[in-house]
Swiss-Prot record:
Species the sequence originates in: Squalus acanthias (Spiny dogfish)
GO BP, one annotated term: digestion
Domain of life: Eukaryota
Annotated protein name in UniProt: Trypsin
Record family assignment: Belongs to the peptidase S1 family.
Cysteine pairings via disulfide bonds: 14-143, 32-48, 116-216, 123-189, 154-168, 179-203
Residue numbers marked as site, Required for specificity: 177
InterPro entries referenced in this protein's UniProt entry, alphabetically: Peptidase_S1_PA, Peptidase_S1_PA_chymotrypsin, Peptidase_S1A, Serine_Proteases_S1, Trypsin_dom, TRYPSIN_HIS, TRYPSIN_SER
Location in or out of the cell: Secreted, Extracellular space
Keyword hit for Methyltransferase: no
Cofactor annotation: Ca(2+)
Single Gene Ontology MF annotation: serine-type endopeptidase activity
Propeptide: 1-7
Length: 229
């Protein structure tokens, strides 16, 4: 099975609260990222599913109490009904918060996309995953600027494994990527949430860019799900 892709390599420490939509999913420890898309709702990857999750908002250094954090428990965790643990198709889930988050400069929403990302568009990926393959996670939020790759490049890197609901973001030459620990976290292009960190082979390896859930295919599912609960 593909590795869950969960740490940023070759990026930089985000300026504090530069990506205030980025949240940490916690079950006694940080295990995945997510994105705040409404005061009461977070989107993440379905492979990050846990029945109960504490969502930590306004975080920068997840090992320290910096005074800006808000912790809110989940009241519902909803995986996409067509999620496949086999090929990670439809790797998206929604987390309903037990109370809406208060928005401020540390905690803010990211817009859902109005269209799909295009090849070559530059995006910001943020997360707390490991900074070296197999190493411990970085405690400060890491950022990476990376381009959306073409479908041809993506399918060429992972023959037979890329569905229409996936896209590759990153560098074919390797050295910069998201990895274990960033899973579920955001890919933001032009102010819109276009990707969710999903999977990849290894981390920052040549010819194996990160694979991301294509959020633009799920906007109606997100709206319908939020409206129905």
């Amino acid at each position: 099975a593909p590795d869950d892709d969960d740490k940023i390599v070759g990026g930089y420490e985000c300026p504090k609260h530069a990506a205030p939509w980025t949240v940490s999913l916690n079950v006694g420890y940080h295990f995945c990222g997510g994105s705040l898309i409404a005061p009461g709702w977070v989107v993440s990857a379905a492979h990050c599913y846990q029945r109960r999750i504490q969502v930590r908002l306004g975080e920068h250094d997840i090992s320290a109490n910096e005074g800006d954090e808000t912790y809110i428990d989940s009241s519902m965790v909803i995986r996409h009904p067509n999620y496949s643990g086999y090929d990670l198709d439809n790797d998206i889930m929604l987390i309903k918060l037990s109370k809406p988050a208060a928005l401020n400069r540390n905690v803010d929403l990211i817009s859902l996309p109005t269209g799909c990302a295009y090849a070559g568009e530059m995006c910001l990926i943020s997360g707390w995953g490991n900074t070296m393959d197999g190493a411990v996670s970085g405690d400060q939020l890491q950022c990476l600027d990376a381009p959306v790759l073409s479908d041809a490049e993506c399918k060429g890197a992972y023959p037979g494994m890329i569905t229409n609901n996936m896209m590759c973001v990153g560098y074919m030459e390797g050295g910069k990527d998201s990895c274990q620990g960033d899973s579920g976290g955001p890919v933001v292009c032009n102010g819109m949430l276009q990707g969710i960190v999903s999977w990849g082979y290894g981390c920052a390896e040549r010819d194996h860019p990160g694979v991301y859930t294509r959020v633009c295919h799920y906007v109606s599912w997100i709206h319908e799900t939020i409206a129905s609960v």
